[in-house]
Amino acid sequence: MSVTEPLILRRWSSRIRTEDCEAYVSYIRGTGVEDYLGTPGNLGCEMLLRDCGDGSTEVSTLSWWQSMESIRAFAGDDVERARYYREDDRFLLEKPDHVEHHHIVVEGLGLRRKLEQS
């Protein structure tokens, strides 16, 4: 891949019970984060939490990718479908069917620099 091709941000969001935040973060570190970082072409990931003030917390996962082919290696052929894990039903209040993909047009995290050095 040429480093001038657009990088891709994959975004997924849902909600959990606020009381489950610590357990959910620990669970995701051992499932989703390991899978993201173990997939060739993944450039990193983050999980964001936002307390909604009603006993629920919004969870957003952002992951950065070199290409749609890299995402396909992580997500399967239907890259638009959300990927779930065995214990997700224990935590998630809703399970959206789809994720969002965005082309990164301005990047200040050093992702391109990492690609150029590899």
Which residues does each PLM region occupy?
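Short, surface-exposed ligand-recognition loops at beta-strand->loop->(often short) alpha-helix junctions
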Residues: R15-I28
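Residue-level signal for secondary-structure boundary sites
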Residues: D20-E22, E69-I71, E107
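An amphipathic, aromatic/His-enriched active-site/gating alpha helix that lines ligand/cofactor pockets
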Residues: Y27-N42, W64-H101
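Intrinsically disordered, low-complexity segments
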Residues: S2, R11-W12, E19
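Short, well-ordered beta-strand segments in beta-rich or mixed alpha/beta enzyme
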Residues: I8-R15, G44-D78
